[in-house]
Amino acid sequence: MRQIKLIIEYDGTNYSGWQVQPNGITIQQLIEASLATMLGEPVKLHSSGRTDAGVHALGMVAAFKTGKLLPLRAFSDGLNALLPNDIAIRDAVEAPLSFNPRADAKSKHYRYTIYNAVRRSPLARLSSWHLRGALDIERMQAAASHFVGEHDFAAFRASNCAAKTTVRRLFSVSVAKDGESVIIDVHGSGFLKNMVRIIAGTLAEVGQGKKNPDAVPGLLVSGDRAASGITAPPQGLCLVEVFY
């Protein structure tokens, strides 16, 4: 028996998220089906986490066990031949049988992209949130600094979040301008449901002048979801990398 670790890139536009569910096609479902076709046996993928419908990934990590003695290249090449063109296996490596993609993850890097221009971009529409009014980047950067460290992020989670604790540690939160895009990079030890999207929505409201940068500490202390920013739409979010 061996365990194969996959690094997966996907465009989440056409899927009901990562995790297998009764209604809707998911990325996990398609990869498991492709593996079953390749190996002639049912396969269960275990992942580093999950992404919601419409969210993308450059570096989702998942692993599965198999007794097949195929070369590693055969797993990536074989899957890429079977999967649709909006899902790709970037790499396949052998991992210890004890490897747990979720429990062993030390941190994750997410990126949220805002397309900040008067006119919408057809090419950017599936990978960014279009906001017309000019955003104040310096105000957003000032607000972003308050998220760094260990905090209770109860005010920055979805109402249906089932996490046992809402305390999380963020190592860095940055905001940068790249042409007509505003890039928000968030690196942390763990995340609550919709946490990055609510942080992005809050920073956008700061950039629009709707919130003060110094309001963030109070929002964190309050634990009040209604007081924080809107949940930014899913298409702007991408899981960039999982660190072990």
Swiss-Prot record:
<feature type="binding site">
    <location>
        <position position="110"/>
    </location>
    <ligand>
        <name>substrate</name>
    </ligand>
</feature>
<comment type="subunit">
    <text>Homodimer.</text>
</comment>
<dbReference type="InterPro" id="IPR001406">
    <property type="entry name" value="PsdUridine_synth_TruA"/>
</dbReference>
<protein>
    <recommendedName>
        <fullName>tRNA pseudouridine synthase A</fullName>
        <ecNumber>5.4.99.12</ecNumber>
    </recommendedName>
</protein>
<feature type="active site" description="Nucleophile">
    <location>
        <position position="52"/>
    </location>
</feature>
<comment type="similarity">
    <text>Belongs to the tRNA pseudouridine synthase TruA family.</text>
</comment>
<dbReference type="InterPro" id="IPR020097">
    <property type="entry name" value="PsdUridine_synth_TruA_a/b_dom"/>
</dbReference>
<dbReference type="Pfam" id="PF01416">
    <property type="entry name" value="PseudoU_synth_1"/>
</dbReference>
<keyword id="KW-0819">tRNA processing</keyword>
<dbReference type="GO" id="GO:0031119">
    <property type="term" value="P:tRNA pseudouridine synthesis"/>
</dbReference>
<dbReference type="InterPro" id="IPR020095">
    <property type="entry name" value="PsdUridine_synth_TruA_C"/>
</dbReference>
<dbReference type="InterPro" id="IPR020103">
    <property type="entry name" value="PsdUridine_synth_cat_dom_sf"/>
</dbReference>
<keyword id="KW-0413">Isomerase</keyword>
<dbReference type="GO" id="GO:0003723">
    <property type="term" value="F:RNA binding"/>
</dbReference>
<dbReference type="InterPro" id="IPR020094">
    <property type="entry name" value="TruA/RsuA/RluB/E/F_N"/>
</dbReference>
<comment type="function">
    <text>Formation of pseudouridine at positions 38, 39 and 40 in the anticodon stem and loop of transfer RNAs.</text>
</comment>
<dbReference type="GO" id="GO:0160147">
    <property type="term" value="F:tRNA pseudouridine(38-40) synthase activity"/>
</dbReference>
